[in-house]
């Protein structure tokens, strides 16, 4: 297999300043991932910090908690504005949920109000679709858009880790499907019901995955995002 941590990939982010929403979740791992690609990674907690970044990552964690804290720290509205203005954003796991325009099974607060998202991606997601923590699993995925990493034998699959991950149940006409979990995946045949489930999508400058590339050391998804920021993908 080719090594995703090639010299070229370690320089692709040079000169870029990429923010990672650092309210909750595995934001540190994402900062390390973009820095491994040569970019400057910065934690984002305040509205003013959104002004000086080239792109933003919304990490995995608890989507309801990130939503709540984004209001407390008053970054929700400015972030939605930046997304509408075209800021490149990548969301992993909970980040995918928060970028979705619709949640099929939203959590509710004590008053019965459904959780909200930042939106931007014309998709419907289902939370914890693959099950709870004990149903976490790993698998290899064919992932579109990684041609820049092709070796003599083509593009290696992406090794993906799913931890209480969502899946996408609907995509709008402007959304490209990048990866799906095989319906015959051994550990989730009953859950998948014979349907290939969408776990990675892109629409314009927005990218989202159900899984956590920052956990496995798989840098190509972050490299794809960086190339999107540069207008090279």
Swiss-Prot record:
Coiled-coil regions, chain positions: none
Reaction equations catalysed: aldehydo-D-ribose 5-phosphate + D-glyceraldehyde 3-phosphate + L-glutamine = pyridoxal 5'-phosphate + L-glutamate + phosphate + 3 H2O + H(+); L-glutamine + H2O = L-glutamate + NH4(+)
Pathway(s): Cofactor biosynthesis; pyridoxal 5'-phosphate biosynthesis
Keyword Zinc-finger part of the UniProt annotation: no
Gene Ontology annotations for the cellular component aspect, listed alphabetically: cytosol; glutaminase complex
Name of this protein: Pyridoxal 5'-phosphate synthase subunit PdxT
Binding residue positions for L-glutamine: 61-63, 127, 163-164
Entry-linked InterPro entries: Class_I_gatase-like (IPR029062), PdxT/SNO (IPR002161), PdxT/SNO_CS (IPR021196)
Function in brief: Catalyzes the hydrolysis of glutamine to glutamate and ammonia as part of the biosynthesis of pyridoxal 5'-phosphate. The resulting ammonia molecule is channeled to the active site of PdxS.
Subunit text: In the presence of PdxS, forms a dodecamer of heterodimers. Only shows activity in the heterodimer.
Gene3D superfamilies: 3.40.50.880
GO terms under biological process: glutamine catabolic process; pyridoxal phosphate biosynthetic process; pyridoxine metabolic process
Keyword Hydrolase included in the entry's annotation: yes
Protein keywords: Glutamine amidotransferase, Hydrolase, Lyase, Pyridoxal phosphate
PROSITE patterns documented for this protein: PDXT_SNO_1, PDXT_SNO_2
Family (UniProt): Belongs to the glutaminase PdxT/SNO family.
Superkingdom, taxonomy of origin: Bacteria
UniProt-listed Enzyme Commission number(s): 4.3.3.6, 3.5.1.2
UniProt organism field: Paenarthrobacter aurescens (strain TC1)
Active site: 93 (nucleophile), 212 (charge relay system), 214 (charge relay system)
Gene Ontology MF term list: glutaminase activity; pyridoxal 5'-phosphate synthase (glutamine hydrolysing) activity
Lineage per the UniProt record: Bacteria, Bacillati, Actinomycetota, Actinomycetes, Micrococcales
